[in-house]
A protein has these predicted regions:
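Short beta-strand to alpha-helix junction loop
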Residues: 53-69, 178-182
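A Rossmann-like FAD-binding core segment of flavoenzymes
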Residues: 69-90, 95-96, 102-103, 166-211
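Single conserved hydrophobic/aromatic residue that forms the stacking wall/gate
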Residues: 210-219
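Short, hinge-like loop/turn segments at secondary-structure boundaries
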Residues: 48-53, 151, 189-193
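FAD-binding core/adjacent interface of flavoenzyme oxidoreductases
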Residues: 1-11, 27, 79-145
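Conserved N-terminal glycine-rich FAD pyrophosphate-binding loop of Rossmann-like flavoproteins
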Residues: 37-60
Length: 219
């Protein structure tokens, strides 16, 4: 099996990994990126980005990530498609094991992303980045004068729904239980004219045409 030595090995080819590689490569450090799949990850699956500084036109996440990767490679980064199955970081030289070869480096950077949460309803993975979003601050402007749904009764869901009321014509707030009456933020949200509250309800699925919202009985 091939053994490749370098100064830095970066696991993950997303924006964090590519940014790190750009800096290390420009510092004349021999750098290798090991990327399982350039088509997955939070940025790669994002359908449209309109708030990235320095990019004046809407761009897909996949295209933006390609530009980041190409810039790192331009300065000497060795980009490789590889699935990491083992790491030994106990010694001075860090060792990373893949089916394609063994990589040794004095520095190891883990930039494997944060897409570990499993889908919670049918269609979530299919529409992620194409209508399903986890960031109202990032994507709220896309939903101006449109109907949008927010699922959840926790603090984060309340904050996201509140942000979306500034853009959407109607925000369908879907909660599996009734908000606590002493939660001032929740009560203010329910008083908002743009909010339609679906209490004791859970989201089963999404499709191109509708949401499936069965009312939960006795929950």
């Amino acid at each position: 099996m091939e053994i490749i030595e370098s100064d830095v090995v970066i696991i993950g080819g997303g924006p964090a990994g590519c940014t790190c590689a750009l800096y290390t490569s420009r510092s004349n450090l021999k750098t290798v990126i090991l990327d399982k799949n350039p088509s997955v990850g939070a940025l790669a699956i994002t359908h449209q980005i309109a708030n990235y500084p320095g990019v004046p036109v809407d761009i897909s996440g996949e295209k933006l990530l390609t530009l980041m990767r190409e810039q790192a490679v331009q300065y000497g980064t060795d980009y490789r498609r590889a699935q990491v199955f083992g790491i030994d970081a106990s010694g001075e030289w860090k060792t990373v094991y893949t089916p394609e070869g063994t990589f040794k480096a004095k520095a190891l950077v883990l930039a494997s992303g944060a897409m570990g949460r499993p889908a919670s309803f049918k269609g979530e993975a299919d529409f992620l980045g194409k209508g399903v979003s986890y960031c109202a601050t990032c994507d709220g402007a896309f939903y101006k004068n449109r109907e949008v749904a927010v699922v959840g009764v926790n603090k984060e869901a309340i904050e996201e729904a509140t942000v979306l009321t500034k853009f959407a014509s109607t925000v369908h707030w879907i909660t599996s239980s009734d908000p606590k009456s002493d939660n001032e933020e929740a009560m203010e949200l329910m008083d908002n004219s743009n909010i339609k509250h679906w209490s004791r309800t859970r989201l089963l699925a999404v499709s191109y045409t509708h949401l499936t919202l069965p009312t939960m009985i006795g929950v």
